[in-house]
Amino acid sequence: MIILNNIITSAAVILMSTLLIPAQVAVGKGSVQNSSISLEFGNENRGMILPWVTNTGAVSGAVEGTVVYDLSDHKVKTKNISGWKDLSVDLTGTTIDPLNSAVDLVTIQNNVTTENLDAVVRIGTPTATPGILVLEDTNKAMILPRVASPHLNIINPAPGMMVYDTTVKQLAVFNGTVWSFWKP
C-alpha cells in the first residue's frame, strides 16, 4: 500500500509541476529570450512555411489572426474581422518549383497517403480554437524567424514562407515568385 501511495503522490507532483511550467517553445535554439514569448525560432536563414489551403473560402471556423497560403490565387492571406486580407500583393505567385519547372509542389504536397485532419499543435492552455499551430497564451507572442534580407539569403524559399527581415525591419512573405514586405 505504501508503494501505491508513493506512486500516486509522485504522479500528482509531476502533474502539478507540468501544469505550472510556462508553455514556451524554442525551435533551432536552446531557449526563448524571455517569459513573454510562446514560440521563437533560431537565427538561421530559414522561414516558417504557412499551411497551404485550396481556397480561403473553404476554410471553416477560421478566427482572426489565422494566416495561410491560398492555392487558388497563390497568395499569403490573413483573416481579420471583415474577411481575408492579401499580404502578397502580387499576381505572379506560383507553386512551380523554380529549380525544376516540371514539378508542381502542390502535386508533391497532395501525394500523401494518410493525412490526419485533426492534427494540431497547441502552445499554452488549450481551447477549441481551430488551426494547425495555435498559440493559446493571452500574454505571450511568437517571434518569427529573423533573417537579414531574406530575398537574398534564403535559397529556394517555399511558397507561403514568412519571416521578419532584420535589415529593413519588416514582415516578409513569399508567394512562390516574389517577396512582399510589410511594415507596421
Segments from the language model and where they lie:
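Bacterial N-terminal signal peptides
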Residues: 10-18
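Sec/Tat signal peptide C-region and signal peptidase I cleavage site
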Residues: 19-23
